[in-house]
């Protein structure tokens, strides 16, 4: 296993192993650990790229109750929305992204979107994530998501640890005894290693 790893021996309390590890990490001083899996990073992406997702592209919406565009998971999705996508990346580059995400988090709360699981996306985790995850790392993650929203929207690590200072954060994939990394989980871990993003 080429990925950084830590082995913990915990008393079994019948809780899911991910929650046991989260509780253990939250008993350590500094920072806070959250169970996020595939909810936080795709959720932040969707809030920032909302105008691109819901752009009035021909043929994307043909039913009033559609929660997302018909071509969201097609390889030409980004190509048809270049202007809106570039505007979102510009917000990351000029520092306005955090306010954009905060505003949309409030404005769009509860509106059905295929990339957002509102029940898992708390104001607390969004605020803490925006405070510590560097814009350049968010940009790298969002570009990776955009390359293949369908497949890259899964396989993200179970837990996120958010520290007290900018740049202090880590993604943690939890495996119980006999559990193995899936291919799509390995792809994300390899990507994080390449980008210098702490993950284990």
Protein language model features and the residues they cover:
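Acidic, glycine-rich flexible loop segments
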Residues: 149-152, 161
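Non-catalytic regulatory appendages
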Residues: 67-70, 84-133
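Asparagine-biased alpha-helical interface segments
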Residues: 134-138, 142-150, 195-198
């Amino acid at each position: 296993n080429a990925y950084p790893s830590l082995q913990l021996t915990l008393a079994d309390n019948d809780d899911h192993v991910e929650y046991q590890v989260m509780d253990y990490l939250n008993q350590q001083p500094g920072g806070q650990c959250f169970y996020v899996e595939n909810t936080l990073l795709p959720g932040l992406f969707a809030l920032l790229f909302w105008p691109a997702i819901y752009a009035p592209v021909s043929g994307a919406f043909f039913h009033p109750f559609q929660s997302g565009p018909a071509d969201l998971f097609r390889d030409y999705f980004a190509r048809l929305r270049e202007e809106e996508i570039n505007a979102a990346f510009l917000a990351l580059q000029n520092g306005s992204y955090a306010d954009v995400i905060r505003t949309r988090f409030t404005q769009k709360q509860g509106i059905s979107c295929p990339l957002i699981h509102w029940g898992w996306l708390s104001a607390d985790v969004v605020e803490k994530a925006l405070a510590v995850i560097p814009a350049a790392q968010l940009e790298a993650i969002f570009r990776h998501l955009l390359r293949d929203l369908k497949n890259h929207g899964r396989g993200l690590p179970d837990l996120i640890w958010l520290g007290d200072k900018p740049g202090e954060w880590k993604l943690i994939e939890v495996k119980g005894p006999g559990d193995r990394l899936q291919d799509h989980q390995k792809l994300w871990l390899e990507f994080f290693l390449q980008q210098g993003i702490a993950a284990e």
